Amino acid sequence: MAFPADLVGGLPTAAYQVEGGWDADGRGPCVWDTFTHQGGERVFKNQTGDVACGSYTLWEEDLKCIKQLGLTHYRFSISWSRLLPDGTTGFINQKGVDYYNKIIDDLLTNGVTPVVTLYHFDLPQALEDQGGWLSEAIIEVFDKYAQFCFSTFGNRVRQWITINEPNVLCAMGYDLGFFAPGVSQIGTGGYQAAHNMIKAHARAWHSYDSLFREKQKGMVSLSLFCIWPQPENPNSVLDQKAAERAINFQFDFFAKPIFIDGDYPELVKSQIASMSEKQGYPSSRLSKFTEEEKKMIKGTADFFAVQYYTTRFIRHKENKEAELGILQDAEIELFSDPSWKGVGWVRVVPWGIRKLLNYIKDTYNNPVIYITENGFPQDDPPSIDDTQRWECFRQTFEELFKAIHVDKVNLQLYCAWSLLDNFEWNDGYSKRFGLFHVDFEDPAKPRVPYTSAKEYAKIIRNNGLERPQ
Protein backbone atom coordinates (compact mmCIF):
# COMPACT_ATOMS: atom_id res chain seq x y z
CA MET A 1 0.00 0.00 0.00
CA ALA A 2 1.89 3.03 -1.26
CA PHE A 3 1.40 6.46 0.28
CA PRO A 4 2.09 9.85 -1.32
CA ALA A 5 5.72 10.91 -0.92
CA ASP A 6 6.72 11.92 2.62
CA LEU A 7 3.19 11.45 3.99
CA VAL A 8 4.22 9.31 6.95
CA GLY A 9 7.37 10.64 8.52
CA GLY A 10 6.50 12.92 11.40
CA LEU A 11 6.61 12.59 15.17
CA PRO A 12 5.72 15.26 17.72
CA THR A 13 6.58 16.15 21.30
CA ALA A 14 5.55 19.07 23.51
CA ALA A 15 7.82 21.18 25.69
CA TYR A 16 6.28 20.60 29.12
CA GLN A 17 5.83 16.89 28.43
CA VAL A 18 9.48 16.15 27.57
CA GLU A 19 11.89 18.97 28.42
CA GLY A 20 12.16 18.99 32.21
CA GLY A 21 14.56 21.70 33.41
CA TRP A 22 11.54 23.47 34.83
CA ASP A 23 13.62 26.15 36.58
CA ALA A 24 16.89 25.78 34.64
CA ASP A 25 18.77 28.65 32.99
CA GLY A 26 16.22 31.38 33.66
CA ARG A 27 13.02 29.62 32.57
CA GLY A 28 9.96 31.16 34.20
CA PRO A 29 7.21 29.00 35.71
CA CYS A 30 4.26 27.94 33.57
CA VAL A 31 0.75 27.01 34.67
CA TRP A 32 1.56 23.28 34.63
CA ASP A 33 4.46 23.86 37.05
CA THR A 34 2.04 25.55 39.44
CA PHE A 35 -0.75 23.02 38.88
CA THR A 36 1.45 19.95 39.48
CA HIS A 37 3.35 21.47 42.42
CA GLN A 38 0.06 22.14 44.20
CA GLY A 39 -0.58 18.37 44.39
CA GLY A 40 -4.06 17.31 45.39
CA GLU A 41 -4.07 14.13 43.26
CA ARG A 42 -5.16 16.02 40.15
CA VAL A 43 -2.32 14.25 38.35
CA PHE A 44 -1.57 10.52 38.70
CA LYS A 45 0.46 10.03 41.90
CA ASN A 46 1.05 13.82 42.01
CA GLN A 47 3.69 13.41 39.29
CA THR A 48 5.18 16.51 37.63
CA GLY A 49 7.03 17.52 34.47
CA ASP A 50 9.93 18.95 36.50
CA VAL A 51 12.34 16.45 34.92
CA ALA A 52 10.16 14.52 32.42
CA CYS A 53 12.35 13.02 29.64
CA GLY A 54 15.14 15.49 30.39
CA SER A 55 15.09 16.71 26.79
CA TYR A 56 16.37 20.14 27.84
CA THR A 57 19.77 18.56 28.54
CA LEU A 58 19.36 15.39 26.45
CA TRP A 59 18.44 16.89 23.06
CA GLU A 60 21.34 14.97 21.46
CA GLU A 61 19.67 11.71 22.57
CA ASP A 62 16.36 12.80 21.05
CA LEU A 63 18.16 13.66 17.82
CA LYS A 64 19.63 10.14 17.71
CA CYS A 65 16.08 8.73 17.93
CA ILE A 66 14.90 11.04 15.15
CA LYS A 67 17.80 9.99 12.90
CA GLN A 68 17.34 6.31 13.73
CA LEU A 69 13.75 6.48 12.45
CA GLY A 70 14.60 8.51 9.35
CA LEU A 71 11.94 11.11 10.17
CA THR A 72 11.07 13.70 7.54
CA HIS A 73 9.32 16.04 10.05
CA TYR A 74 9.73 16.70 13.76
CA ARG A 75 7.03 18.70 15.49
CA PHE A 76 8.02 20.25 18.81
CA SER A 77 6.66 23.07 20.91
CA ILE A 78 8.43 26.08 22.35
CA SER A 79 8.17 26.63 26.10
CA TRP A 80 6.85 30.20 26.09
CA SER A 81 8.26 30.84 29.59
CA ARG A 82 11.68 29.43 28.63
CA LEU A 83 11.97 32.11 25.96
CA LEU A 84 10.09 34.89 27.76
CA PRO A 85 10.03 34.13 31.51
CA ASP A 86 7.15 36.50 32.28
CA GLY A 87 5.44 35.89 28.92
CA THR A 88 6.29 39.32 27.51
CA THR A 89 9.12 40.50 25.29
CA GLY A 90 10.26 42.83 28.09
CA PHE A 91 12.87 40.23 29.07
CA ILE A 92 14.26 37.63 26.65
CA ASN A 93 16.01 34.56 28.03
CA GLN A 94 18.93 34.04 25.63
CA LYS A 95 19.61 30.50 26.88
CA GLY A 96 16.09 29.57 25.83
CA VAL A 97 16.65 31.08 22.39
CA ASP A 98 19.94 29.14 22.10
CA TYR A 99 18.22 25.85 23.00
CA TYR A 100 15.58 26.13 20.27
CA ASN A 101 18.10 27.46 17.74
CA LYS A 102 20.15 24.32 18.29
CA ILE A 103 17.12 22.04 17.83
CA ILE A 104 16.13 23.78 14.59
CA ASP A 105 19.68 23.85 13.21
CA ASP A 106 20.34 20.20 14.10
CA LEU A 107 17.09 19.10 12.46
CA LEU A 108 17.88 20.98 9.25
CA THR A 109 21.45 19.64 9.19
CA ASN A 110 19.94 16.15 9.26
CA GLY A 111 17.34 16.81 6.57
CA VAL A 112 14.39 16.95 8.98
CA THR A 113 11.69 19.63 8.60
CA PRO A 114 10.85 21.41 11.87
CA VAL A 115 7.13 21.95 12.57
CA VAL A 116 6.97 24.39 15.49
CA THR A 117 4.08 24.85 17.92
CA LEU A 118 4.09 28.19 19.72
CA TYR A 119 1.81 27.19 22.56
CA HIS A 120 1.03 23.68 23.82
CA PHE A 121 -0.93 24.14 27.10
CA ASP A 122 1.98 25.73 29.04
CA LEU A 123 0.99 29.38 29.55
CA PRO A 124 3.54 31.41 31.53
CA GLN A 125 2.25 31.66 35.10
CA ALA A 126 2.87 35.43 35.07
CA LEU A 127 0.23 35.77 32.33
CA GLU A 128 -2.23 33.49 34.11
CA ASP A 129 -1.85 35.72 37.17
CA GLN A 130 -3.20 38.56 35.01
CA GLY A 131 -6.26 36.57 33.91
CA GLY A 132 -4.73 34.23 31.33
CA TRP A 133 -7.04 33.29 28.45
CA LEU A 134 -10.05 34.77 30.25
CA SER A 135 -8.59 38.25 29.72
CA GLU A 136 -8.68 40.02 26.35
CA ALA A 137 -5.23 41.43 27.15
CA ILE A 138 -3.77 38.01 26.25
CA ILE A 139 -4.54 38.58 22.55
CA GLU A 140 -1.91 41.26 22.07
CA VAL A 141 0.60 39.49 24.35
CA PHE A 142 0.26 36.27 22.32
CA ASP A 143 0.65 38.19 19.07
CA LYS A 144 3.88 39.78 20.31
CA TYR A 145 5.19 36.37 21.44
CA ALA A 146 4.33 34.91 18.02
CA GLN A 147 6.07 37.79 16.24
CA PHE A 148 9.14 37.27 18.42
CA CYS A 149 9.27 33.59 17.41
CA PHE A 150 8.66 34.35 13.73
CA SER A 151 11.46 36.92 13.68
CA THR A 152 13.87 34.76 15.73
CA PHE A 153 13.33 31.34 14.13
CA GLY A 154 11.25 31.95 11.00
CA ASN A 155 14.21 32.19 8.63
CA ARG A 156 14.54 28.40 9.18
CA VAL A 157 10.99 27.31 10.11
CA ARG A 158 8.36 27.04 7.38
CA GLN A 159 5.52 25.31 9.25
CA TRP A 160 3.97 26.84 12.35
CA ILE A 161 1.16 25.83 14.69
CA THR A 162 -0.02 28.75 16.82
CA ILE A 163 -2.10 26.90 19.44
CA ASN A 164 -2.30 23.18 20.12
CA GLU A 165 -5.80 21.81 20.75
CA PRO A 166 -7.48 25.03 21.90
CA ASN A 167 -10.77 23.12 22.13
CA VAL A 168 -9.30 20.71 24.71
CA LEU A 169 -7.57 23.44 26.68
CA CYS A 170 -10.67 25.64 26.94
CA ALA A 171 -12.92 22.82 28.16
CA MET A 172 -10.37 21.17 30.46
CA GLY A 173 -8.46 24.21 31.72
CA TYR A 174 -11.07 26.95 32.03
CA ASP A 175 -14.45 25.19 32.17
CA LEU A 176 -14.05 21.89 34.04
CA GLY A 177 -10.74 22.81 35.68
CA PHE A 178 -9.16 19.35 35.24
CA PHE A 179 -6.13 20.77 33.38
CA ALA A 180 -3.88 23.67 34.36
CA PRO A 181 -4.63 26.40 35.25
CA GLY A 182 -7.45 24.53 37.01
CA VAL A 183 -10.08 27.24 36.54
CA SER A 184 -13.56 25.80 36.99
CA GLN A 185 -16.03 28.26 35.48
CA ILE A 186 -18.54 25.76 34.18
CA GLY A 187 -20.62 26.96 31.25
CA THR A 188 -18.76 30.27 30.87
CA GLY A 189 -14.97 29.94 31.26
CA GLY A 190 -14.40 27.63 28.30
CA TYR A 191 -16.35 29.85 25.93
CA GLN A 192 -14.60 33.01 27.10
CA ALA A 193 -11.14 31.43 26.75
CA ALA A 194 -12.06 30.13 23.28
CA HIS A 195 -13.26 33.56 22.17
CA ASN A 196 -9.89 35.06 23.08
CA MET A 197 -7.88 32.15 21.63
CA ILE A 198 -9.58 32.41 18.25
CA LYS A 199 -8.80 36.14 18.11
CA ALA A 200 -5.22 35.60 19.33
CA HIS A 201 -4.61 32.95 16.67
CA ALA A 202 -6.05 35.21 13.97
CA ARG A 203 -3.91 38.17 15.08
CA ALA A 204 -0.76 36.02 14.98
CA TRP A 205 -1.67 34.71 11.50
CA HIS A 206 -2.14 38.27 10.22
CA SER A 207 1.18 39.32 11.75
CA TYR A 208 2.89 36.48 9.90
CA ASP A 209 1.01 37.29 6.71
CA SER A 210 1.86 41.00 6.69
CA LEU A 211 5.35 41.04 8.25
CA PHE A 212 7.04 37.69 7.54
CA ARG A 213 5.37 35.63 4.82
CA GLU A 214 6.88 37.36 1.80
CA LYS A 215 10.43 36.77 3.01
CA GLN A 216 10.06 33.52 4.99
CA LYS A 217 7.48 31.81 2.74
CA GLY A 218 6.05 29.68 5.55
CA MET A 219 2.60 28.48 6.58
CA VAL A 220 0.62 29.01 9.79
CA SER A 221 -2.31 27.09 11.25
CA LEU A 222 -3.58 25.71 14.56
CA SER A 223 -4.11 22.07 15.63
CA LEU A 224 -7.66 21.00 16.46
CA PHE A 225 -8.50 17.88 18.45
CA CYS A 226 -11.49 15.78 17.44
CA ILE A 227 -13.18 12.71 18.88
CA TRP A 228 -15.26 11.41 15.96
CA PRO A 229 -18.95 11.51 17.04
CA GLN A 230 -20.90 8.53 15.70
CA PRO A 231 -24.70 8.52 16.22
CA GLU A 232 -25.64 5.68 18.60
CA ASN A 233 -28.60 4.76 16.42
CA PRO A 234 -27.87 5.81 12.82
CA ASN A 235 -31.62 5.55 12.05
CA SER A 236 -32.60 7.90 14.87
CA VAL A 237 -33.03 11.52 13.77
CA LEU A 238 -32.48 12.60 17.40
CA ASP A 239 -29.10 10.81 17.55
CA GLN A 240 -28.08 12.09 14.11
CA LYS A 241 -28.78 15.65 15.23
CA ALA A 242 -26.97 15.00 18.53
CA ALA A 243 -23.88 13.84 16.60
CA GLU A 244 -24.06 17.00 14.48
CA ARG A 245 -24.20 19.13 17.63
CA ALA A 246 -21.28 17.13 19.05
CA ILE A 247 -18.96 17.97 16.17
CA ASN A 248 -20.26 21.56 16.02
CA PHE A 249 -19.48 22.20 19.69
CA GLN A 250 -16.20 20.30 19.80
CA PHE A 251 -14.60 20.99 16.44
CA ASP A 252 -16.48 23.41 14.19
CA PHE A 253 -16.60 25.88 17.11
CA PHE A 254 -13.00 26.74 16.16
CA ALA A 255 -12.79 25.51 12.58
CA LYS A 256 -15.79 27.35 11.13
CA PRO A 257 -14.70 30.86 12.24
CA ILE A 258 -11.14 30.29 11.06
CA PHE A 259 -11.70 28.35 7.83
CA ILE A 260 -15.14 29.52 6.65
CA ASP A 261 -16.71 32.80 7.73
CA GLY A 262 -15.31 34.23 10.97
CA ASP A 263 -18.24 33.13 13.13
CA TYR A 264 -19.41 30.24 15.30
CA PRO A 265 -21.74 27.52 13.95
CA GLU A 266 -25.41 28.60 14.00
CA LEU A 267 -26.38 25.48 15.98
CA VAL A 268 -23.87 26.34 18.70
CA LYS A 269 -25.07 29.94 18.94
CA SER A 270 -28.75 28.96 19.11
CA GLN A 271 -28.22 26.15 21.66
CA ILE A 272 -26.18 28.32 24.06
CA ALA A 273 -28.53 31.31 23.66
CA SER A 274 -31.57 29.14 24.35
CA MET A 275 -30.00 27.49 27.43
CA SER A 276 -28.74 30.85 28.72
CA GLU A 277 -32.27 32.25 28.50
CA LYS A 278 -33.71 29.26 30.41
CA GLN A 279 -31.06 29.80 33.09
CA GLY A 280 -32.01 33.44 33.55
CA TYR A 281 -28.96 35.03 31.92
CA PRO A 282 -29.68 38.48 30.42
CA SER A 283 -27.83 37.43 27.23
CA SER A 284 -26.06 34.40 25.79
CA ARG A 285 -23.09 33.00 27.71
CA LEU A 286 -21.27 32.88 24.35
CA SER A 287 -19.77 36.23 23.34
CA LYS A 288 -20.41 37.59 19.85
CA PHE A 289 -17.77 38.53 17.32
CA THR A 290 -18.14 42.01 15.84
CA GLU A 291 -18.36 42.30 12.04
CA GLU A 292 -14.81 43.67 12.09
CA GLU A 293 -13.60 40.66 14.12
CA LYS A 294 -15.33 38.21 11.76
CA LYS A 295 -13.40 39.71 8.83
CA MET A 296 -10.18 39.51 10.85
CA ILE A 297 -10.73 35.83 11.81
CA LYS A 298 -11.97 34.44 8.48
CA GLY A 299 -9.36 32.58 6.42
CA THR A 300 -6.56 32.62 8.98
CA ALA A 301 -5.06 29.17 8.34
CA ASP A 302 -2.83 27.91 5.54
CA PHE A 303 -3.52 24.19 6.07
CA PHE A 304 -5.85 22.11 8.23
CA ALA A 305 -4.12 20.46 11.22
CA VAL A 306 -6.16 17.83 13.06
CA GLN A 307 -5.49 15.44 15.95
CA TYR A 308 -7.46 12.20 16.19
CA TYR A 309 -7.22 9.49 18.82
CA THR A 310 -10.63 7.91 19.22
CA THR A 311 -14.37 7.80 18.53
CA ARG A 312 -17.44 7.91 20.77
CA PHE A 313 -21.07 7.02 20.24
CA ILE A 314 -23.37 9.99 20.74
CA ARG A 315 -26.94 10.00 21.92
CA HIS A 316 -29.40 12.84 22.46
CA LYS A 317 -29.77 13.86 26.11
CA GLU A 318 -32.27 16.63 26.75
CA ASN A 319 -31.09 19.21 29.29
CA LYS A 320 -34.44 19.32 31.11
CA GLU A 321 -33.05 20.92 34.27
CA ALA A 322 -31.18 23.60 32.28
CA GLU A 323 -27.87 22.57 33.88
CA LEU A 324 -24.70 24.52 33.13
CA GLY A 325 -21.96 22.90 31.05
CA ILE A 326 -20.71 22.39 27.50
CA LEU A 327 -22.19 18.88 27.10
CA GLN A 328 -25.40 20.17 28.68
CA ASP A 329 -25.53 23.05 26.19
CA ALA A 330 -25.03 20.56 23.36
CA GLU A 331 -27.60 18.17 24.88
CA ILE A 332 -25.50 15.11 24.19
CA GLU A 333 -24.10 12.08 25.95
CA LEU A 334 -20.88 10.31 24.88
CA PHE A 335 -20.03 6.65 25.46
CA SER A 336 -17.86 3.84 24.10
CA ASP A 337 -18.79 0.48 22.63
CA PRO A 338 -17.71 -2.15 25.20
CA SER A 339 -16.17 -4.18 22.36
CA TRP A 340 -13.68 -1.42 21.50
CA LYS A 341 -10.24 -2.26 22.85
CA GLY A 342 -7.89 0.34 24.22
CA VAL A 343 -6.11 1.89 27.18
CA GLY A 344 -7.60 4.69 29.27
CA TRP A 345 -9.66 7.15 27.24
CA VAL A 346 -8.20 5.99 23.90
CA ARG A 347 -10.53 3.33 22.52
CA VAL A 348 -9.12 1.95 19.26
CA VAL A 349 -11.50 2.89 16.43
CA PRO A 350 -9.47 3.17 13.20
CA TRP A 351 -12.52 3.78 10.97
CA GLY A 352 -13.21 7.02 12.86
CA ILE A 353 -10.18 8.72 11.34
CA ARG A 354 -11.43 8.13 7.80
CA LYS A 355 -14.85 9.54 8.68
CA LEU A 356 -13.23 12.61 10.25
CA LEU A 357 -10.97 13.23 7.24
CA ASN A 358 -13.99 13.03 4.92
CA TYR A 359 -15.93 15.41 7.15
CA ILE A 360 -13.09 17.95 6.91
CA LYS A 361 -12.85 17.49 3.14
CA ASP A 362 -16.60 17.98 2.63
CA THR A 363 -17.15 20.75 5.19
CA TYR A 364 -13.99 22.80 4.66
CA ASN A 365 -13.60 22.80 0.88
CA ASN A 366 -11.09 19.96 0.51
CA PRO A 367 -8.15 21.61 2.31
CA VAL A 368 -4.58 20.37 2.63
CA ILE A 369 -4.72 18.27 5.84
CA TYR A 370 -1.96 17.47 8.31
CA ILE A 371 -2.64 14.87 11.00
CA THR A 372 -0.42 16.43 13.65
CA GLU A 373 -1.16 13.78 16.30
CA ASN A 374 -2.59 10.26 16.36
CA GLY A 375 -1.53 7.49 18.67
CA PHE A 376 -2.20 4.66 21.07
CA PRO A 377 -0.94 4.30 24.64
CA GLN A 378 0.33 1.36 26.62
CA ASP A 379 -0.21 1.04 30.34
CA ASP A 380 2.83 1.22 32.58
CA PRO A 381 4.85 -1.01 32.71
CA PRO A 382 4.82 -1.30 28.92
CA SER A 383 5.99 -4.06 26.62
CA ILE A 384 9.02 -3.20 24.46
CA ASP A 385 7.67 -5.69 21.93
CA ASP A 386 4.42 -3.76 21.46
CA THR A 387 3.19 -5.78 18.48
CA GLN A 388 -0.43 -5.41 19.59
CA ARG A 389 -0.11 -1.63 19.66
CA TRP A 390 1.51 -1.64 16.24
CA GLU A 391 -1.53 -3.49 14.91
CA CYS A 392 -3.63 -0.43 15.92
CA PHE A 393 -1.30 1.78 13.87
CA ARG A 394 -1.42 -0.66 10.94
CA GLN A 395 -5.22 -0.62 10.89
CA THR A 396 -5.13 3.18 11.04
CA PHE A 397 -2.77 3.34 8.04
CA GLU A 398 -5.19 1.14 6.08
CA GLU A 399 -7.95 3.69 6.77
CA LEU A 400 -5.63 6.54 5.70
CA PHE A 401 -4.86 4.65 2.50
CA LYS A 402 -8.60 4.44 1.72
CA ALA A 403 -9.13 8.10 2.61
CA ILE A 404 -6.37 9.15 0.19
CA HIS A 405 -6.94 6.75 -2.71
CA VAL A 406 -10.70 6.11 -2.56
CA ASP A 407 -12.07 9.30 -0.99
CA LYS A 408 -9.42 11.63 -2.51
CA VAL A 409 -8.74 13.39 0.79
CA ASN A 410 -5.83 15.84 0.43
CA LEU A 411 -3.74 14.44 3.31
CA GLN A 412 -0.12 15.59 3.14
CA LEU A 413 1.41 14.75 6.53
CA TYR A 414 0.88 12.16 9.26
CA CYS A 415 2.52 12.42 12.69
CA ALA A 416 2.20 9.63 15.26
CA TRP A 417 2.14 10.73 18.90
CA SER A 418 4.84 10.59 20.20
CA LEU A 419 8.60 10.34 19.75
CA LEU A 420 9.06 9.53 23.46
CA ASP A 421 7.09 8.24 26.40
CA ASN A 422 6.38 11.44 28.32
CA PHE A 423 4.32 13.29 30.92
CA GLU A 424 0.75 12.70 29.75
CA TRP A 425 -0.99 15.52 31.62
CA ASN A 426 -3.43 14.15 34.24
CA ASP A 427 -2.17 10.61 33.56
CA GLY A 428 1.40 11.56 34.51
CA TYR A 429 3.77 8.79 33.41
CA SER A 430 1.15 6.01 33.71
CA LYS A 431 0.28 6.03 29.99
CA ARG A 432 3.03 5.53 27.44
CA PHE A 433 2.49 6.86 23.92
CA GLY A 434 6.13 6.96 22.81
CA LEU A 435 7.70 5.05 19.95
CA PHE A 436 10.76 5.13 22.21
CA HIS A 437 10.60 3.80 25.75
CA VAL A 438 11.99 6.14 28.41
CA ASP A 439 13.17 4.75 31.75
CA PHE A 440 11.99 7.50 34.09
CA GLU A 441 13.64 5.82 37.11
CA ASP A 442 17.12 6.07 35.57
CA PRO A 443 18.70 9.56 35.88
CA ALA A 444 20.12 9.13 32.36
CA LYS A 445 16.56 8.63 30.99
CA PRO A 446 17.71 6.11 28.35
CA ARG A 447 15.62 5.89 25.16
CA VAL A 448 14.98 2.39 23.76
CA PRO A 449 12.93 1.77 20.59
CA TYR A 450 9.70 -0.18 20.86
CA THR A 451 8.83 -2.61 18.06
CA SER A 452 6.49 0.17 16.84
CA ALA A 453 9.50 2.44 16.25
CA LYS A 454 11.13 -0.15 13.99
CA GLU A 455 7.88 -0.68 12.07
CA TYR A 456 7.32 3.08 11.73
CA ALA A 457 10.84 3.44 10.33
CA LYS A 458 10.01 0.78 7.71
CA ILE A 459 6.93 2.72 6.58
CA ILE A 460 9.00 5.88 6.24
CA ARG A 461 11.69 4.00 4.32
CA ASN A 462 9.25 2.20 1.99
CA ASN A 463 6.77 5.08 1.73
CA GLY A 464 3.99 2.65 2.47
CA LEU A 465 2.72 -0.34 4.36
CA GLU A 466 3.68 -3.91 3.63
CA ARG A 467 0.64 -6.15 3.61
CA PRO A 468 0.60 -8.57 6.57
CA GLN A 469 1.78 -12.05 5.58
Curated annotation (Swiss-Prot):
Binding-site residues for substrate, renumbered to this chain: Q17, H120, N164, Y309, W417, E424, W425
- Recount the known activity regulation: Inhibited by 2,4-dinitrophenyl-2-fluoro-2-deoxy-beta-D-glucopyranoside.
State the name under which the record lists this protein: Cytosolic beta-glucosidase
Similarity section: Belongs to the glycosyl hydrolase 1 family. Klotho subfamily.
The gene coding this protein: Gba3
Active site: which residues? E165 (proton donor), E373 (nucleophile)
Checking Gene3D superfamilies in the record gives: Glycosidases
Catalytic class of the enzyme: hydrolase
Q: What is its main location?
A: cytoplasm
The superkingdom of the source organism is Eukaryota
Primary role: Neutral cytosolic beta-glycosidase with a broad substrate specificity that could play a role in the catabolism of glycosylceramides. Has a significant glucosylceramidase activity in vitro. However, that activity is relatively low and its significance in vivo is not clear. Hydrolyzes galactosylceramide/GalCer, glucosylsphingosine/GlcSph and galactosylsphingosine/GalSph. However, the in vivo relevance of these activities is unclear.
Describe the processing and modification events after translation.
Answer: The N-terminus is blocked.
One example GO MF annotation: galactosylceramidase activity
List keywords of the entry alphabetically: Cytoplasm, Glycosidase, Hydrolase, Lipid metabolism
Q: Where in the cell is it found?
A: Cytoplasm, Cytosol
Q: Which GO terms describe its biological process?
A: beta-glucoside catabolic process; carbohydrate metabolic process; galactosylceramide catabolic process; glucosylceramide catabolic process
Organ and tissue specificity:
Present in hepatocytes (at protein level).
Name any one Pfam family assigned in the record: Glyco_hydro_1
EC number(s) per entry: 3.2.1.21, 3.2.1.46, 3.2.1.45
Q: So what does this thing catalyse? A: Hydrolysis of terminal, non-reducing beta-D-glucosyl residues with release of beta-D-glucose; a beta-D-glucosyl-(1<->1')-N-acylsphing-4-enine + H2O = an N-acylsphing-4-enine + D-glucose; a beta-D-galactosyl-(1<->1')-N-acylsphing-4-enine + H2O = an N-acylsphing-4-enine + D-galactose; beta-D-glucosyl-(1<->1)-sphing-4-enine + H2O = sphing-4-enine + D-glucose
